[in-house]
Amino acid sequence: MIESYTLNKPLNNKTNSDTILAQITASAKDEVLNFIYLGKQEYNKMWKIQKQIHELVKNDNMPSIVLFLEHDHVYTFGKNSNKDFLLDSYPDNTQIVESDRGGQITYHGPGQLIGYPIINLNHFTKSVSWFMRSLEQIIIMTLHEYNISADRKEGMTGVWVDNEKICAMGVRLSRWTSMHGFALNINPDMKYFDCMIPCGIFDYGVTSMYDVLSKEIEVKEII
């Protein structure tokens, strides 16, 4: 069973991590997969919250949950990322974070739907490939509802429209419990992708729902 909800009290970038964590844990329901929308949040604050929730879910002290949100402008490096994939021309208003997720460099910012599934796979299917393919399939099906022909690309992660990536993915699993997740480009400022080699891939580009449809879509509408 799936339960979707937003928090009773509005959140913003100034809401501290302890308050956000307390509201999430108080609202999550047992025996369902919980979905929650947190609005726009700073990356490091949410990384801290992710790690705290991950410990709870991993030890069966909290049900599995998917956090939906947007971030302020930030470039994040995966554990083994090549730092040369970020070009010197990146905007001054962009934060840089070295993360513990898998994958290479990626960008997060306004106009992207970020999804952090913190899921104990011991209660589902203990398979990394199953988990990644499931995330990809959910995004593909969502995009199909907007008449966007999206699919996987052989040998690559994420979701693609022809030769352009529309959704990047990078996760971390510990004791079969996931954290980090995906970034779906809805209507972000695409200039931020010009300052890096997205996911370390030279041969293909990046696109967004706005680029494909030529119309703006509210991020929260996708959830």
Located regions from the model:
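N-terminal lobe of the biotin/lipoate ligase/transferase fold
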Residues: M1-W160, K165-I166
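Short, conserved beta-strand/beta-arch hydrophobic-aromatic motifs that form part
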Residues: N80-L86, Q95, M169-I186, M190
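Short, structured patches in soluble enzyme cores that scaffold and shape functional sites
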Residues: P117-I119, L173, L184-P188, Y210-L213
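Short conserved catalytic/interaction loops centered on acidic-Pro-aromatic/His motifs
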Residues: I148-K153, M179-H180, K191-M196
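C-terminal accessory segment of soluble enzyme catalytic cores
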Residues: K191-I223
